[in-house]
Design a protein with these regions (language model features):
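Alpha-helical segment proximal to the catalytic Tyr-Lys
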Residues: 128, 174-178, 237
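C-terminal substrate-recognition "lid" of short-chain dehydrogenase/reductases
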Residues: 120, 135, 181-182, 217-246, ...
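Conserved glycine-rich Rossmann-like NAD(P)H-binding loop of the short-chain dehydrogenase/reductase
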Residues: 29-45
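Active-site helix of classical SDR
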Residues: 123, 161, 169
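Residue(s) in the substrate-gating loop at a strand-loop-helix junction
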Residues: 143
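Substrate-binding pocket helix/loop in short-chain dehydrogenase/reductase
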Residues: 99-100, 107-112, 205, 209
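Conserved glycine-rich cofactor-binding loop
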Residues: 8, 15-16
Length: 253
C-alpha cells in the first residue's frame, strides 16, 4: 500500500526544512525525484544521500519558485530527464513578516510571492505536464495558521499566504477534477525540523504547547510524512480538495 515506485515527484523547497524531509519520505516509498530550490549545493548533498539510501533517481534543479522563467526552465529539465510528472509537492516557503501596524510593502510582497504565488506558478506549469498522462497528485503545504489566527505572533502576511494556499487548493481541485489530477493541502502544526528544533526544544515552547496544543507536544517527522505519502498515492484517487490539518488538535479548539 502507498507504493510510489515508478512515479516521478517534483518537490520544491528541498534544500531545507519540510521540503527536504518530504523528498526523503517520497523517495523512501520508491518515487524518483526532481528536487527544486535556490541553493543547488544543498540539493546535490540531498541527491547523493537519497540515491545511496533508496536507489531512486534524483534530479537537482536550481530554481527560484517566484520566477516564471526559472519554473519554465525547471519544467524543461524535468521533462527531458523523466518524460513525465506524477506528483507535485509545493513545500517552498519563507516569511519576512510583522504585525499589521508595522509591516512594509516589501515584507508583504516577499511573503505572498514565496508562499502563495509560487503555488500558483508551479501548479500552472506542472499541471500542464500532468494532463498529458491524465494523472497527477498536487500536494500543497499550507499551515494551521491558514485556518486560524494567532494573536501572539506578528505574522499577518504568513497567515494570509497560507489561507490563500488553502483556498487555491480547493479551486484547483474543482477545476481539474475530471482531468485525473487531484489537489489537496496539508496544514502542519508545530513540527521539528533542522530549522525549528532549537525553538521547539526550549522550556518556553514546551509550556506554550501545553497551553495551546491538545496533545501537548510538537509533531514527529513520520506523523507528517504519512499524510503526504497517502495523498501522493494511487489510493488517494478519490480525495481532492481536502484540507488536512496535522497539528495535534490545535485547530479543533
Amino acid at each position: 500500500m502507498f507504493n510510489l515506485k515508478g512515479r516521478v515527484a517534483v518537490v520544491t523547497g528541498a534544500s531545507s526544512g519540510l521540503g527536504r524531509q518530504m523528498a526523503r519520505a517520497l523517495a523512501g516509498q520508491g518515487a524518483d525525484l526532481a528536487i527544486l530550490a535556490r541553493r543547488v549545493e544543498r540539493l546535490e548533498e540531498l541527491k547523493h544521500e537519497i540515491e545511496k539510501k533508496y536507489g531512486v533517481k534524483v534530479l537537482p534543479v536550481q530554481c527560484d519558485v517566484t520566477k516564471t522563467t526559472d519554473i519554465d526552465a525547471a519544467v524543461a529539465q524535468v521533462k527531458t530527464e523523466f518524460r513525465k510528472v506524477d506528483i507535485l509537492l509545493n513545500c517552498a516557503g519563507s516569511s519576512k513578516d510583522a504585525g499589521i501596524l508595522d509591516m512594509t510593502d516589501d515584507q508583504w510582497d516577499f511573503t505572498i510571492a514565496t508562499d502563495l504565488t509560487s503555488v500558483f506558478k508551479m501548479t500552472r506549469a506542472f499541471a500542464n505536464v500532468m494532463k498529458e498522462n491524465h494523472y497527477g497528485r498536487i500536494i500543497n503545504i499550507a499551515s494551521m495558521y491558514g485556518l486560524v489566527g494567532n494573536t501572539a505572533m506578528g505574522t499577518v502576511a504568513y497567515h494570509a499566504s497560507k489561507g490563500g494556499v488553502v483556498n487555491i487548493t480547493r479551486a484547483i481541485a474543482a477545476e481539474l477534477a475530471t482531468s485525473g489530477i487531484t489537489c489537496n493541502a496539508i496544514c502542519p502544526g508545530y513540527f521539528e525540523t533542522e530549522l525549528t528544533k532549537p525553538v521547539l526544544d526550549t522550556a518556553e515552547f514546551q509550556a506554550f504547547a501545553k497551553q495551546t496544543v491538545p496533545m501537548q507536544r510538537y509533531g514527529q517527522e513520520g506523523e507528517l510524512n504519512a499524510g503526504a505519502i497517502f495523498l501522493a498515492s494511487d489510493e488517494a484517487s478519490y480525495v481532492t480538495g481536502a484540507i488536512l490539518p496535522i497539528d495535534g488538535g490545535y485547530t479543533c479548539i
